[in-house]
Amino acid sequence: MKEKPIIGVTPDLAKNCQKYTYADFPWYALRRNYTDAIIAAGGIPILLPYQSDTINQLMELIDGIVIPGGDEDIHPKFYEQKYAEDLVISNEERDHFEILVLKKALEKDIPILGICRGMQLLNVMFNGTLIKHIPDYIRHFSKLTYSKKFECNTEAFATTVYTLPIKLEFENAPIKTIINHTQPKPKNIVSHTINIEVSTKLSKIANNCLQTMVNSTHHQAVNKLGNDLIISAKAEDGIVEAIEATKHKFVIGVQWHPEYLNDNGIDLQLFKALVKASKYI
């Protein structure tokens, strides 16, 4: 058993270099919260560069993997045949690299935590599909204000009470919701409730607290669930908030951003669970 397992993290790749830096070369981008969360959980983070010829050696080095979020969508060609090319905003280099990383990691049963876009990619890897734009899929109601107080008592976590205001808008779409899944800034604070399924890995990580609050900054979501996956949490409008694999030791995806380590009884515990699982590979 390793004292501090090595957790590989795939970065984003920025190519609009003239706007952001002094040299006209691509650069890797990764919010510090990811590495801070891994360190806080007892792991050592390392960046995984986009060189496919290094993958096999990296897989021998790392003990766990985090696939983080990002601004660009997974290209729909990876999960459906028909799509409008002019509506696609993606980073295919990142898609191809992360798919390769996940394929190798799943073959070796390396523990994986997918976050936001990372969860969506996990679903695609298991032959699932995505809702390409939530506002086209759900119906928001206008001229209403919704407040909810949430409270959960467990042995592990102190009681936390949240008051949640939600401003609602109307759109003509098939599913009703009161949740804005792309919350306004600040995007790190919790904004809506999720309901966790009993007897899942996620419920154990949350110490059997089956409801908590999370942040939300995504416009896509799981549509058709991938093979050998189960849904371990949903938002109150039915949008999938967490998935996990049934035939692997630790493969969990969450739609929110736990790297901000909100005091909600689950964010830090997710990273601790990943690090713990990574000690025993």
UniProtKB/Swiss-Prot annotation:
Biological classification of the source: Bacteria, Pseudomonadati, Pseudomonadota, Alphaproteobacteria, Rickettsiales
Membrane-spanning segments: none
GO molecular function list: gamma-glutamyl-gamma-aminobutyrate hydrolase activity; transferase activity
Listed InterPro entries: Class_I_gatase-like, Peptidase_C26, PuuD-like
Domain RPE1 insert: 139-174
Keyword Transferase attributed: yes
Any single GO BP term: polyamine catabolic process
Residue ranges occupied by any Glutamine amidotransferase type-1 domain in the UniProt entry: 19-281
Disulfide cross-links: none
PANTHER family per UniProt: GLUTAMINE AMIDOTRANSFERASE PB2B2.05-RELATED (PTHR43235:SF1)
UniProt name for this protein: Putative glutamine amidotransferase-like protein RP404
Keywords: Glutamine amidotransferase, Transferase
A Pfam family the protein falls into: Peptidase_C26
Source organism of this protein record: Rickettsia prowazekii (strain Madrid E)
Annotated SUPFAM superfamilies: Class I glutamine amidotransferase-like
GO cellular component, one term: cytosol
